[in-house]
Amino acid sequence: MLDGLKMEENFQSAIETSASFSSLLGRAVSPKSVCEGCQRVISDRFLLRLNDSFWHEQCVQCASCKEPLETTCFYRDKKLYCKYHYEKLFAVKCGGCFEAIAPNEFVMRAQKSVYHLSCFCCCVCERQLQKGDEFVLKEGQLLCKGDYEKERELLSLVSPAASDSGKSDDEESLCKSAHGAGKGTSEDGKDHKRPKRPRTILTTQQRRAFKASFEVSSKPCRKVRETLAAETGLSVRVVQVWFQNQRAKMKKLARRQQQQQQDQQNTQRLSSAQTNGGGTAGMEGIMNPYTAMPTPQQLLAIEQSVYNADPFRQGLTPPQMPGDHMHPYGAEPLFHDLDSDDTSLSNLGDCFLATSEAGPLQSRVGNPIDHLYSMQNSYFTS
């Protein structure tokens, strides 16, 4: 009995030691790590750990310049970047100079755009806008309140004959509001005629430079306008107005061309409809009412075949009445009272001609209802 107990205790102790040994082996032998960069198993002695992922030493390099990263790095979309290329690719850019904005810089925001403090200025007078100033963001460009009102006055003074090039949608709305205000003040007698500003006449070289820049971009940025103004010797305001007028002119030409194409298509459709379907439709409308009438003999044969046909007796039970004269569904002819001379047939033809407009069914001489009435009268009189 004691020997059996000792054997069980030795067996249990052996199981416990084997389990502890296997657990130790499991902790020591861990699965090999996979590099996040090259997706290969890391078998090196040393490895690098970045954001809970493992890397080879040679795989830790910038994805743009391929330079090894030693001290710091930037991680985005499972790729590593150095500071310079990360800011160049992913940093927020200024809406004025289109350069990257450093994280430690102060910025000014206008709707969805972000600007440097030095770039947050009016595109006409180049006055830096401060906090609390009123401004207008038009086509991605900043305008202070004074220059915006001047632009509205300038657009309102342009007559329709002088501005044959047309205006854009937003400029047209501004002009309409300005003209409406002017009319109201002139009726009150308080408005006086403003002096017209001198019109700038461009030279051939200036016009060529503007057109070449317009072909590249119809809405140039502030730097491009400044360079054009410096090259041509004009002000930035004149350059901006020329580009606005040119854009409006292109829009008007496109609308006019589209309208001409629509007019041509409409004229072609009308001409084709007149040549193809006009004459035939008219002749058909004239000839349809005057169809040939059948002869009286044909009409008589048709009526006899219609009223003596078998479908009149389908689903009906002949009445069981005394007398041989009651055979409403019999085979006796319908037109037995008519004479066979030509006069009766001519009268029948006149009857058909008189009732031809009422339809073929109404123009028949006999009628099943009349036949039933005649049978009823003959029954009660007998």
UniProtKB/Swiss-Prot annotation:
Q: Which residues bind DNA?
A: 195-254
Q: Which terms under GO biological process does the entry name?
A: axon guidance; cerebellum development; dentate gyrus development; locomotory behavior; memory; midbrain dopaminergic neuron differentiation; negative regulation of neuron differentiation; olfactory behavior
Spell out the subcellular localization from the entry: Nucleus
Q: Where is the composition biased (Low complexity)?
A: 256-269
Give one Pfam family: Homeodomain
The alphabetized UniProt keywords are:
Activator, Developmental protein, DNA-binding, Homeobox, LIM domain, Metal-binding, Nucleus, Repeat, Transcription, Transcription regulation, Zinc
| SUPFAM superfamilies assigned to the protein according to its UniProt record, in alphabetical order | Glucocorticoid receptor-like (DNA-binding domain), Homeodomain-like
The terms describing its cellular component in GO are: nucleus
Query: Principal localization?
Result: nucleus
Q: GO molecular-function annotation terms?
A: DNA-binding transcription activator activity, RNA polymerase II-specific; metal ion binding; RNA polymerase II transcription regulatory region sequence-specific DNA binding
State the InterPro entries in the record. Answer: HD, Homeobox_CS, Homeodomain-like_sf, LIM_Homeobox_TF, Lmx1a_LIM1, Znf_LIM
Q: What does this protein do?
A: Acts as a transcriptional activator by binding to an A/T-rich sequence, the FLAT element, in the insulin gene promoter. Required for development of the roof plate and, in turn, for specification of dorsal cell fates in the CNS and developing vertebrae.
Designated name of the protein: LIM homeobox transcription factor 1-alpha
The root-end lineage is:
Eukaryota, Metazoa, Chordata, Craniata, Vertebrata
Q: Name the gene for this chain.
A: LMX1A
